[in-house]
Curated annotation (Swiss-Prot):
GO cellular component: cytoplasm; Holliday junction resolvase complex
Key words, A-Z: ATP-binding, Cytoplasm, DNA damage, DNA recombination, DNA repair, DNA-binding, Hydrolase, Nucleotide-binding
Protein name as annotated: Holliday junction branch migration complex subunit RuvB
KW Nuclease (keyword) present: no
Stretches for region Large ATPase domain (RuvB-L): 1-181
Reactions mediated catalytically: ATP + H2O = ADP + phosphate + H(+)
Organism in which the protein naturally occurs: Streptococcus agalactiae serotype Ia (strain ATCC 27591 / A909 / CDC SS700)
Lineage: Bacteria, Bacillati, Bacillota, Bacilli, Lactobacillales
Protein localization: Cytoplasm
Binding-site list for DNA: 291, 310, 312, 315
Length: 332
């Protein structure tokens, strides 16, 4: 079954996201704290005619880290080279990328926490002093070659900032914590998307979609497309609050933005473990999901919305979880 509330990009969504991507900070909706800081740092770097300090963007998937990287490059008026941690398998791959940079370029590395340690270590001198030392040849004939690099800005994006080594994390002069979006910001994003794709939607429908999109623009845009389909087949094409509710109910997205996987997690905790505490590994086995998937994709939203608490002995379902799913609590 397709999980419509998965915050990772699926299929042609990356193409759609590029179409919707704002170009400048003034067009970027939400994340005001990060934007306000970046605006000052970017203007100061341009005033001094220097490259911007290296930037680390971290937070849950689907919140616009990649979009923000492109916006930063546009604000600086420079080129952006894009890659990802898993794509850089060995040091030579990174050396080739670094050697291709022009002065002032932005190098964007998505999922930077997934780079091998040997590759990561190449970045240390590159980030701090704009040079790398590479080994040429093998055995007794090998020699070290010093390679100067032009000043550049590295933007790293990660969903798991805690997995970055201390030496790498310390080399980022700017950090931006991307947080779940407020409903009013998501409503504005949904209305903007609808306008770009010439969809007819009421404000009430956009607000309802925002409320059930887990604070995540990627999910909001995905659900909007499915609600549009429902409106075209089951209605007259207008996306109103009634059509929206029926479509999202069909997709198993409830009024709190929880889908069948979220509810399965909560029901398992309540029915099998009396609400907890239960270890993450045990819970993952019971719902047939990878531990990392539960920790990265499902748990953050459930914690943020107050359905789950983390304790020293494990995860615990809250009173709100019991009430939301219609369970009576007998352990109090």
């Amino acid at each position: 079954m397709t999980r419509f509330l998965d915050s990772d990009a699926m299929g042609d969504e990356e193409l759609v996201e590029r179409t919707l991507r704002p170009q400048y900070l003034r067009e970027y909706i939400g994340q005001d704290k990060v934007k306000d800081q970046l605006k000052i740092f970017i203007e100061a770097a341009k005033l001094r005619d220097e490259s911007l300090d290296h930037v680390l963007l971290f937070g849950p998937p689907g919140l616009g880290k990649t979009t923000m990287a492109f916006v930063i490059a546009n604000e600086l008026g420079v080129n952006l080279k894009q890659t990802s941690g898993p794509a850089i398998e060995k040091s030579g791959d990174l050396v080739a990328i670094l050697n291709d940079l022009e002065p002032g370029d932005v190098l964007f590395i998505d999922e930077i926490h997934r780079m091998p340690m040997a590759v990561e270590e190449v970045l240390y001198s590159a980030m701090e002093d704009f040079y790398i030392d590479i080994m040429i040849g093998a055995g007794e004939t090998s020699r070290s070659v010093h390679l100067d690099l032009p000043p550049f800005t590295l933007i790293g994006a990660t969903t798991r900032a805690g997995m970055l080594s201390n030496p790498l994390r310390a080399r980022f002069g700017i950090t931006g914590h991307m947080e779940y979006y407020e409903e009013n910001d998501l409503t504005e994003i949904i209305e903007r998307t609808a306008d770009i794709f010439e969809m007819k939607i009421t404000y009430e429908a956009a607000s309802e979609l925002a409320r059930r999109s887990r604070g995540t623009p990627r999910i909001a845009n995905r659900l909007l497309k499915r609600v549009r389909d429902y409106a075209q087949i089951m209605g007259d094409g207008l996306i109103d609050d009634n059509i929206t509710d029926k479509a999202l109910t069909m997709l198993d997205v409830d009024h709190e933005g929880l889908d069948y996987v979220d509810q399965k997690i909560l029901r398992t905790m309540i029915e099998m473990y009396n609400g907890g505490p239960v270890g993450l590994g045990t819970l993952s086995v019971n719902i047939a999901e990878e531990r990392d998937t539960v920790e990265d994709m499902y748990e953050p939203y459930l914690i943020q919305k107050g359905f789950i608490m983390r304790t020293r002995t494990g995860r615990v379902a809250t009173d709100k979880a019991y009430e939301h799913l219609g369970y009576q609590r007998f352990d109090k």
